[in-house]
Amino acid sequence: MPELDRKSARVFSGKVVRKDLVRKVKVGANVPVFVLEYLLGKYCATDDAAAIEAGLRVVNTTISSNFARPDEANKAQSMVKDKGKHTLIDKVKVRYLADDDKHWAELVNFGHKYVHIPEHFLREYDRLLMGGIWAQVDIRHQYDEEAKGKRSPFWIDGLKPIQVATFDLEEFRESRRQFSSEEWLDLLLRTIGLEPKNFDRRLKLLFLVRMIPLCEQNYNLVEMGPRGTGKSYAYQELSPYTILLTGPTTVPNLFYNMATGKMGLVGIWDAVAFDEVADLQKMQKEVVTTLKTYCESGTFARGKDALTGRASVAMFGNTNQPVDVMVRSSHLFMPMPEVIREDMAFLDRLHFYIPGWEIPKMRVEYFTDHYGFVVDYLAEALRDLRKHNFTEAIDRHFSLGSHLNARDVKAVRKTVSGLIKLIYPHGEMSRDELAEIVELAVEGRRRVKEQLKKLGSFEYHQTSFSYIDNETREERFVGVPEQGGRDMISSDPLAPGSAYTASVDDQGKVGLYRLEVGCSPGTGKLKIAGGIEGTMKESIQRAFAYLAA
């Protein structure tokens, strides 16, 4: 067994699982990933090939006989009645009804909302009352004709959570100290099913940026890139606390329904992700307007009330052109629907733009066969970390440059905070490790501002983003690779006939130009094309006269 697998299994005993086995079972079973991982951890926690094969057979048998499918609810209820008792894998929710002065359990796929549950389970697993948990349930059929109040024939005799029912953040942080940052990065990547040896350090960090909305409150993320790069995976499979929307939504659904008095998605979920963002073209303008206010402050107004939410927002879209074409001919928000891309104030509230074109399309060889966290355990860790704040961590060693305004600083700080929660949850990192994530955070925010500069001209002209070492006072400027980064003007000698020049207008704005002179057969006469007037036209005529002499 490789060293990292051995260490992971030792330090996080019972909380890691072999990811290749998850894929093998997932293909043939439409059940939540954390249910599969629980069963695999129970029956396949070994290196013995024969034992693993036997364990896989048990897992498949357990799923086929115990997993309750929603379309077979009546069949499952009838089977429990006929057999007298049965073991099911289902999601269990518990609510208190004052009229009955009693707690009732609901088995979601079993299709019954009134199941008797012993009170001691509520004391052991308080999450039963807060959204519910997936569990292995021993259910019994016994009809009591003498019972008072609401009658139900179904009773829970045993309940064993499949999800993490309790989580200790301090234990998680202490365990993190036993890994180097490189080992921890690799373990996180294997948790989402990827083999880290296929990716360089930068790509590993970009994969983790996708997960920042899961651990950072009110974080606004956008990613545009080719299809098939796994943009929305974390919001479908990694956490039960996120929701992925695949089409237009409404203000009542997303924020607050005044008719029913119920909170919308941003008040229920930790992160709300929009997949295929181009499909939002038909979304009402009011949604974007309200979302714009929410993305700035986490608040929104409905009727007379000002309400708050903590959900982060992630937007994913597909590009139909190579990035170099978009950079030259338009801007990187072009794949977004018109209702969003024309609202510069909304775009300015995005904290990070992931360059999805750098991430390769997923291939079979990119998937890992090694140990990673049980996804539900990591989901609990990320959810617990949302309560903590690392936005001031950057001040230990660095300060931000003068071109970053208040929104830019907020965006960079939140990105740094999110990456620290993911990579350094114990809060310990070197100066160089902090510099690495600060530089990435600055780059992601600058990518947003560079597009706004194209859309809004000089209103967003200050994009020379930098950060300063507080000890040496060295200022490091951060570029965006798709526009040439800091090497857009090469240090190599220019070809003959080419030159760079700069000019300052009457408002003090600086413009940088590249002049290229070509040579082709002509008539010997000067013809000035375009709308050139005044001083520039006279300069050209004077230069031509000089050459003609």
Where do the language-model regions lie?
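Extended, charged/polar low-complexity intrinsically disordered regions
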Residues: 1-191
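Dynamic helix-loop-helix/coil hinge segments at AAA+ ATPase domain boundaries and subdomain interfaces
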Residues: 171-205, 529-537
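Helical mechanochemical/support elements of P-loop NTPase systems and associated helical scaffolds
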Residues: 180, 184, 283, 287, ...
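Conserved, well-folded catalytic cores of nucleic-acid-processing
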Residues: 191-195, 280, 294-298, 319, ...
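Conserved ASCE/P-loop NTPase catalytic core
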Residues: 195-325, 330-334, 348, 468-483
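A short helix-turn-beta junction within AAA+ P-loop NTPase domains corresponding to the substrate/partner-engaging
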Residues: 327-361
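Conserved NTP phosphate-binding and transfer environment spanning the P-loop NTPase/kinase superfamily
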Residues: 351-479
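Conserved P-loop NTPase/AAA+ ATPase motor core
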Residues: 480-549
